[in-house]
């Protein structure tokens, strides 16, 4: 632990060189954080929410619509491919976003390429505008990639 901020920065800078549009991911900067007389390297980004918009995580979206946890529902589905299909189908059904499957493909490709092992239903989301219309959210939270947590599995 401790390198997540740097990883966010590096991954976002590498995504600048990809075929993704700038609005498809969050661009991070490094930030020095002083805490209890120690300095830590963190990160920050511009607020990607337009005025009056909200970030709705998939867990919150599903719970708000079905009054049931998405996590609990997913664990009743044995196959990973069926879980992904369920996530895409339900998100498109609830939000009306028609290309959520393509969005999920981008997230999973980024996570695979950068070895991000911390993708979950609280860091995948959609945006809701002031008129309660849903939009794709920029991809964020790639900080567990690039072996940033290697010391947890292999203490040095």
Describe the residue ranges of each PLM region.
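Conserved kinase catalytic-core segment
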Residues: 18, 82-148
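ATP-dependent phospho-/nucleotidyl transfer catalytic cores
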Residues: 47-108
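Conserved ATP-binding subdomain of kinase catalytic cores across diverse folds
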Residues: 1-70
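Primarily interfacial, aromatic-capped hydrophobic alpha-helices that serve as membrane anchors
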Residues: 148-156
């Amino acid at each position: 632990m401790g390198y997540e901020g740097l990883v966010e920065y590096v991954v976002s800078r590498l995504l600048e060189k990809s075929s993704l549009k700038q609005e498809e991911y969050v661009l991070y900067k490094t930030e020095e954080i002083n805490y209890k007389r120690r300095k830590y390297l963190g990160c920050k980004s511009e607020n990607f929410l337009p005025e009056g918009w909200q970030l709705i995580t998939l867990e919150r979206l599903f719970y708000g619509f079905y009054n049931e946890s998405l996590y609990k529902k997913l664990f009743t589905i044995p196959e990973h491919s069926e879980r992904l299909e369920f996530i895409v189908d339900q998100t498109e059904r609830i939000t009306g976003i028609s290309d959520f499957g393509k969005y999920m493909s981008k997230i999973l490709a980024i996570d695979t390429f950068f070895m991000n092992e911390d993708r979950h239903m609280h860091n995948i989301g959609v945006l809701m505008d002031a008129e309660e219309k849903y939009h794709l959210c920029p991809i964020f939270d790639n900080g567990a990639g690039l072996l940033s947590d290697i010391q947890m599995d292999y203490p040095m």
